[in-house]
């Protein structure tokens, strides 16, 4: 009886070890795939920061826009921010909102990352799983002053891993903040009011050149 139990324990231990050894490469591959878009984004941000205010806003915008398209699932973010208002909208209004939201998102990043003063970015190679999503932790570290944490919530789509939310200081959801603002505008004036607000914000962020 004792020998039988010992053999069972050995078999179970070997099985567990085999499972863990096979699961580890899969998890590592998932982490690498989820982190890759954020590395692309950070490289783009550093590029426009080094270009700086001396480079026209629209030129920096043109540099970053395709990178945002490759790293963010803007459609998913917009729909999550708009919520139940989205489905009833005619396709043409959805397209208008999507275009305005894309311009606003890119303009926000170009405006926020507008000058390079020795800042560096740290991207954690290890992600944090939350349901079917992966959180990529990043830090913006200035030469002087406090560091800032920006965590990117990644979700896998047919196009690969894409950002579906950004957590400022590790907890403040950009989608949640937008949701309150967007739905208030939709309630008051519908899709047109939201689109106009996004266009106005984009123009303000770009000093009228957006």
Predicted feature residues:
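Extracytoplasmic
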Residues: 33, 43, 59, 63, ...
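Short beta-strand edge/turn micro-motifs at domain boundaries
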Residues: 147-177
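Surface-exposed, charged secondary-structure patches
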Residues: 106-148, 198-210
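Early exported N-terminus immediately downstream of N-terminal targeting peptides
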Residues: 31-109
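Sec/Tat signal peptide C-region and signal peptidase I cleavage site
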Residues: 24-30
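Low-complexity, intrinsically disordered terminal/linker segments enriched in charged
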Residues: 167-210
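Bacterial N-terminal signal peptides
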Residues: 13-22
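N-terminal export leaders
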Residues: 6-12
